[in-house]
Swiss-Prot record:
It is found in: Membrane. This is Cytochrome P450 monooxygenase apdE. Keywords: Glycoprotein, Heme, Iron, Membrane, Metal-binding, Monooxygenase, Oxidoreductase, Transmembrane, Transmembrane helix. Belongs to the cytochrome P450 family. One of its GO terms (molecular function) is oxidoreductase activity, acting on paired donors, with incorporation or reduction of molecular oxygen, reduced flavin or flavoprotein as one donor, and incorporation of one atom of oxygen. It is a single-pass membrane protein. The chain crosses the membrane at residues 27-47. Its EC number is 1.-.-.-. Heme binds at C466. Its cofactor is heme.
Length: 519
């Protein structure tokens, strides 16, 4: 007797349907596996053919514990970001490996490199073969904080964004140190008496917030005078830290869900909306009266941008991607300088003597620019604590990089469309082959006869080089020179080692606890 004859008809049909369903699932799974294997095989054959056609060597591979998906490196990165040891983790990834190697990031080919020549090629020679948009905007990594801006787009859209922000970085702006005087006066007034411990980092952040808002919006927020206005500064810190996590996750940012980050974004948006609404209202009044906006008393960046962009959300996006990252750059840079000087009193004294040798001379841009040892201190800080730890680009057409292939790593490598190249600048800046056995040491004297090129790239290079370098240098130099005219020595009051918390770049987790002495 058959099984079918012993079962009720309904039960038999149910079993039959279930069997057909399971067979279908098996068939679909089998077809998927076959298709995947076929696609991978064809892709590998095509890649190898192109690699050989370009005369390129094989790229060494990272020794994954999970070679299929690369979850080991994904989870390692996530853990390091969550527990604030990303810089340590990144250095360990490069330990005992060639200077260029291939990483599997959940199916996406990442090429990690610390070769200056590859940085040069990606940033300057073949820069149009690479793009930032797929890494930042196309996958909504910066949304809802911002959309289009100089840091997130390519091509003509990037050229337009660059046009919008150009006045902020013009020579007349960064050479005018008088715009800093009042705000530095206020910082010096708020520093405690001789020998009292102070975490100077939040104070510097408020100082730079005051400086930046004056230049961007035509009026300073004056958070040093009105501390209750400072929360916008801390909201920007939260936004930047969230952005760093989202950018690191690449196309898997759906794993990032933090309501606190969205709340911080809302705080920043409300603040900017008020300035944008005021500016558009003033522009409309100018136009109603038949006046030329270029002849207005206002010469701040927002006025210029609003005159050339009439879409409120688009304007807010553009200003977000300048205002928030820029506010973190100089303040954290100065914090890093003071963190190091507090641990090297001899360097502080040598730098101070150079400042005192100026007498009562005005601290103009030209004067500060010619202070060799002060600038060496700035460069050494940039080297050990670059604001941009990595430079990441997605390849948008098949191309090559000059080195990294073959057994000796000297052959060019083939980079196919869709590959992601990550130059780890923090590792380059500490490479013993470039900087010597004391590469980890803070030693400004190394800059006395040093003329670096692509092995020192704190602001990137090529057409997309960050235009803020001279602005940051002028602001940091002026602040430090004013401080050194007042305080004879500096002392560290935090014995803990540096722990880098990632935002745009790293900042010390515990701040900068120091004591300053006038005598």
């Amino acid at each position: 007797m058959s099984l079918a004859s012993t079962l009720p008809r309904a039960s038999f049909e149910t079993l039959l349907q279930h069997t057909n369903f399971m067979d279908g699932i098996k068939f679909v799974f089998f077809a998927f596996v076959v298709y995947s294997c076929f696609t991978i095989a064809v892709g590998w054959v095509v890649y190898e053919w192109k690699r050989k056609a370009h005369g390129c060597g094989k790229i060494p591979r990272y020794p994954h514990r999970d070679p299929f998906f690369g979850f080991d490196i994904v989870f390692g990165m996530a853990k390091s970001l969550r527990n604030d040891y990303f810089l340590v983790w990144l250095n360990k990834v490069h330990e005992n490996l060639p200077k260029t190697f291939l990483v599997n990031f959940v199916g996406t080919r990442f090429i990690y490199t610390i070769e200056p020549e590859n940085m040069k090629s990606m940033s300057a020679i073949n820069w149009q073969d690479f793009a930032v948009g797929p890494m930042r905007r196309n996958n909504k990594a910066t949304a809802p904080f911002a959309d289009k801006g100089v840091n997130t787009v390519d091509g003509h859209e990037w050229e337009f964004s660059r046009f919008l922000i150009k006045p902020f970085f013009k020579r007349e702006t960064f050479t005018d140190t008088s715009r800093l005087t009042l705000h530095v006066d206020r910082v010096l007034e708020q520093l405690p008496a001789d020998g009292e411990t102070v975490n100077i980092q939040p104070l510097i952040q408020r100082w730079f917030l005051d400086v930046t808002t004056a230049s961007l919006f035509g009026e300073s927020i004056e958070s040093l005078v009105y501390p209750e206005r400072a929360p916008i500064c801390w909201a920007m810190v939260d936004v930047l830290r969230g952005l760093r996590l989202r950018l690191q996750w690449y196309k898997y940012l759906w794993l990032f869900r933090h309501q606190a980050w969205l709340d911080a974004v809302e705080v920043v948006h409300r603040y900017l909306n008020a300035h944008i609404d005021r500016t558009y209202k003033e522009l409309d009044e100018y136009k109603r009266q038949g006046k030329n906006p270029e002849a207005a008393d206002r010469n701040d960046l927002l006025w210029y941008m609003a005159s050339n962009l009439q879409d409120k959300e688009a304007l807010r996006s553009q200003i977000c991607l300048i205002f928030v990252p820029n506010n973190d750059t100089t303040s954290i840079f100065i914090s890093h300088i003071l963190w190091n000087l507090a641990r090297h009193p001899g360097i502080y004294e040598k730098c101070r003597q150079e400042v005192l040798a100026l007498g009562d001379a005005e601290l103009s841009f030209s004067v500060l620019r010619n202070m060799k040892y002060l600038n060496a201190v700035l460069n050494e800080t940039h080297r050990l604590f670059p604001n941009g730890v990595t430079q990441v680009r997605k390849c948008i057409r098949d191309t090559t990089l000059p080195v990294g292939g073959g057994p000796d790593g000297k052959q060019p490598i083939f980079v196919r469309k869709g590959d992601v190249v990550q130059v780890n600048k923090n590792v380059i800046h500490r490479d013993h082959d470039i900087w010597g056995p004391d590469a980890e040491d803070f030693r400004p004297e190394r800059w006395e006869n040093l003329r670096p090129y692509w092995n020192f790239v704190p602001f990137g290079g090529g057409p997309r080089r960050c235009p803020a370098q001279m602005l940051v240098t002028a602001e940091a130099s002026y602040f430090l020179a004013r401080l050194m005219r007042v305080y004879k020595r500096i002392e560290a009051r935090d014995p803990n080692p540096y722990v880098g918390v990632m935002r745009v770049g790293p900042s010390n987790k515990t701040g900068v606890h120091i004591a300053l002495f006038k005598e």
